[in-house]
């Protein structure tokens, strides 16, 4: 009888789930549950790590959240295990600990510490105990054999530059390599902040970055000295302490830091130096890519470092895996996800100073690589390479990264598989990240109830015209429906803070949204539009600054680019909006790079665009280029391209315009450009 009473409810359950948009998601429930268990285990492991450090050092309860403490722990637990492979050089975790100890001692000398003629003997590790003594207070560091000399002569590498002070920021302008890591870890051990400076910056942008993070010293690669020579007077005028990371003929006042490091003993330094007062203290600055202006110095906290230790565990990577990393270390993907993520599980990383598509698979075979960390462009480079024997005999089982376009994704897996691709989404300064743990092509993550319970976020309606979220009459934001593009936001909390940028609170303007769903709440604004489909998969739609309006409709640059990339004669596409005099909004423009040895087929291109895009989304202008303008992490320069416009008298690239009357893309001559400005050419 009871079963008969429950029967109507059971029959109505699918309808209820369908109404709540949950029915299509049920097929993915096993994967959602499996990832939720993994995520909870990861959180528990990180918490246990922090608690173990607190128990070992009651006076520094936050010490276990520091990078220095984790390295010291690995040097004890996995001393002989290979941590780093760079070319022919290999370093174990214990060797990494000793190398970073040398670097820490060199930096502490610049702070005014006197280790004595034999370098002293601290008697404790970075994770150990010790009497608290602020360096610079004039007291001897307990058990360290070092005294703070202070004053004159404390800083040795920068000539007339001011000595370093406790807690100062030291900027690194170095290529990816072991020395980058030892200096970074050494700075962390010495209680100093590090700033990762993009290696391509020079002149104004470089000086801006150094000023914004308050750098007091700069360590630069010797190979950069020639291009930096015009900047040296300005760097000295800023009072920067200057070092070169290697031998050579250096300008006056610049000494070889690596020589100073090698002269130090490799004994540990006092652990209290690297123990943060608060887990949200800033320990690192990483600069944003600067696609929309000058780079901003994102504040990276010890909490972020701890969270990034769990990245590879979340991805299902194990401590016996070998990770291939060919990304710049001055960006989060290389340093925090790649290096810190590897340290989180105690695995091995094969570090490349520069990515080589032709050498990649041979490297993977030589070092028995099992995990490859990518950004989308690297995968595209690989699929565009001619076939080789090495690409089929590898042991790579997992590719983890971001920015992989669906067409490249399919070609990559079909050609180099079987392997799993885990596409992720995240921001350097953000408090939200997603992982496509199912491998569904084209998705950057899942919006399952389980995932959002562990890592909360929301998609809210957004007006691309006003650049603001759409709010209801009560002033609250509204969640999107399945298939509707929405602004990705995440609640700011003690566990998921937003620390902003160095240089002033005005730099974070617009990054925080208040009263989103209820009075008083605060959410981080990612500035990215995502779409959640009826199965709960998240797909990247566009950046808010990239989406534009034309003919009263919203145009997503990524969607237009995907249509273009289906053409076999196109290798790269960059879509953006340009202002056209006499027209509202912005017209679409596409910069194209041909795939050798193909030629541009304007007739096929027009037919393809007309069949696959609505009229308002079809680019009005084309620009043929040898290569696309990108940042060093291969992010397309849309703002720069939009500012350059489409004037044939100022651009040397071949330009084309969509002539609606003719129904074709025609060369944009000076005459047609004048006709367009006069309103005689309909676009």
Swiss-Prot record:
Q: Which reaction does it catalyse?
A: a fatty acid(in) = a fatty acid(out); a long-chain fatty acid + ATP + CoA = a long-chain fatty acyl-CoA + AMP + diphosphate; hexadecanoate + ATP + CoA = hexadecanoyl-CoA + AMP + diphosphate; (9Z)-octadecenoate + ATP + CoA = (9Z)-octadecenoyl-CoA + AMP + diphosphate
Keywords per UniProt = ATP-binding, Fatty acid metabolism, Ligase, Lipid metabolism, Lipid transport, Membrane, Mitochondrion, Nucleotide-binding, Transmembrane, Transmembrane helix, Transport
Q: Where is this region: Disordered?
A: 119-145
UniProt-listed Pfam families: AMP-binding, AMP-binding_C
For this chain, one GO molecular function annotation is: ATP binding
Q: Where is the composition biased (Gly residues)?
A: 119-128
Q: List ligand-binding residues for ATP.
A: 288-292, 331, 428, 528, 543, 635
Provide the E.C. number(s) assigned to this enzyme: 6.2.1.15, 6.2.1.3, 6.2.1.-
GO cellular component terms attached to this protein's record:
endoplasmic reticulum; endoplasmic reticulum membrane; membrane; mitochondrial membrane; mitochondrion; plasma membrane
Main enzyme class: ligase
User: What does the tissue specificity note say?
Assistant: Expressed in bronchial and bronchiolar epithelial cells (at protein level).
Q: How does it sit in the membrane?
A: Single-pass membrane protein
A Gene Ontology biological process term: fatty acid transport
Q: Which residues cross the membrane?
A: 3-23
Q: Which domain of life is it from?
A: Eukaryota
Q: Where can this protein be found?
A: Mitochondrion membrane
Similarity-based family: Belongs to the ATP-dependent AMP-binding enzyme family.
Q: What does this protein do?
A: Mainly functions as an acyl-CoA ligase catalyzing the ATP-dependent formation of fatty acyl-CoA using LCFA and very-long-chain fatty acids (VLCFA) as substrates. Can mediate the levels of long-chain fatty acids (LCFA) in the cell by facilitating their transport across membranes.
What this protein is called in its record is Long-chain fatty acid transport protein 3
Q: What is the protein's species of origin? A: Homo sapiens
- Lineage of source species: Eukaryota, Metazoa, Chordata, Craniata, Vertebrata
């Amino acid at each position: 009888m009871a079963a008969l009473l429950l029967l109507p409810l059971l029959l109505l359950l699918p309808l209820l789930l369908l109404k709540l948009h949950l029915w299509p998601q049920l097929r993915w429930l096993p994967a959602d549950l499996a990832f939720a268990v993994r995520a909870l285990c990861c959180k528990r492991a990180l918490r246990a790590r922090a608690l173990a450090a607190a128990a070992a050092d009651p006076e520094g309860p936050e010490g276990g959240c520091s990078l220095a403490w984790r390295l010291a722990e690995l040097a004890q637990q996995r001393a002989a295990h290979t941590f780093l492979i760079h070319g022919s050089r290999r370093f174990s975790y214990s060797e990494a600990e000793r190398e970073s100890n040398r670097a820490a001692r060199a930096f502490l000398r610049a702070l005014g510490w006197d280790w004595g003629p034999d370098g002293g003997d601290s008697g404790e590790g970075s994770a150990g105990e010790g009497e608290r003594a602020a360096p610079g207070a004039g007291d001897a560091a307990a058990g360290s054999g070092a005294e703070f000399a202070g004053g004159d002569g404390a800083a040795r590498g920068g000539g007339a530059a001011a000595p370093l002070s406790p807690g100062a920021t030291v900027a690194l302008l170095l290529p990816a390599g072991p020395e980058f890591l030892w200096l970074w870890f050494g700075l962390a051990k010495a209680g100093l902040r590090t700033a990762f400076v993009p290696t391509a910056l020079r002149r104004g942008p470089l000086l801006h970055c150094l000023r914004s993070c308050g750098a007091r010293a700069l360590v630069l690669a010797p190979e950069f000295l020639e291009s930096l020579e015009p900047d040296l007077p300005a760097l000295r005028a800023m009072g920067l302490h200057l070092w070169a990371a290697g031998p050579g003929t250096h300008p006056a006042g610049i000494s070889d830091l690596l020589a100073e490091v090698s002269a130090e003993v490799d004994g540990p330094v006092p652990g209290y130096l690297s123990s943060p007062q608060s887990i949200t203290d800033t320990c690192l600055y990483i600069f944003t890519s600067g696609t929309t202006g000058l780079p901003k110095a994102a504040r990276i906290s010890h909490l972020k470092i701890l969270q990034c230790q769990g990245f590879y565990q979340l991805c299902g990577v194990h401590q016996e895996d070998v990770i291939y990393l060919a990304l710049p270390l001055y960006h989060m993907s290389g340093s925090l996800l790649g290096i810190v993520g590897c340290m989180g599980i105690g695995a091995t990383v094969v570090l490349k100073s520069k990515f080589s598509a032709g050498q990649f698979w041979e490297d993977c075979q030589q070092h028995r690589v099992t995990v490859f960390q990518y950004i989308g462009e690297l995968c595209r480079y690989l699929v565009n390479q001619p076939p080789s024997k090495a690409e089929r005999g590898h042991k790579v089982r997992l590719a983890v990264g971001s920015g992989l376009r669906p067409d490249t994704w399919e070609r990559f897996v079909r050609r180099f598989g079987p392997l799993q691709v885990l596409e992720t989404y995240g921001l350097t300064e953000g408090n939200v990240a997603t992982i496509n743990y199912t491998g569904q092509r084209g998705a950057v993550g899942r919006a399952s109830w389980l995932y959002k319970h562990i890592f909360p976020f929301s998609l809210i309606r957004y007006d691309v015209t006003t650049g603001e979220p759409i709010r209801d009459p009560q002033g609250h934001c509204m969640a999107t429906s399945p298939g509707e593009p929405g602004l990705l936001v995440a609640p700011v909390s003690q566990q998921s803070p937003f620390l902003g940028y160095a240089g002033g609170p005005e730099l974070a303007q617009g990054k925080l949204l208040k009263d989103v769903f209820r009075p008083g709440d605060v959410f981080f604004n990612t500035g990215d539009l995502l779409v959640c489909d009826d199965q709960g998969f998240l797909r990247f739609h566009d950046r808010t600054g990239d989406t534009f309006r034309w003919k009263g409709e919203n145009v997503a640059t990524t969607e237009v680019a995907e249509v273009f990339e289906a053409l076999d004669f196109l290798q790269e596409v960059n879509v953006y909006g340009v202002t056209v005099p006499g027209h509202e909004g912005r017209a679409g423009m596409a910069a194209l790079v041909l795939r050798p040895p193909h030629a541009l087929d304007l007739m096929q291109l027009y037919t393809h665009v007309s069949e696959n895009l609505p009229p308002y989304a079809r680019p009005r202008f084309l620009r043929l280029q040898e290569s696309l303008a990108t940042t060093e992490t291969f992010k397309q320069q849309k703002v720069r391209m939009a500012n350059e416009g489409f004037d044939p008298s100022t651009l040397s690239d071949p330009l084309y315009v969509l002539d609606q009357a003719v129904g074709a893309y025609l060369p944009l001559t000076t005459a047609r450009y004048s006709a367009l400005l006069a309103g005689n050419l309909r676009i």
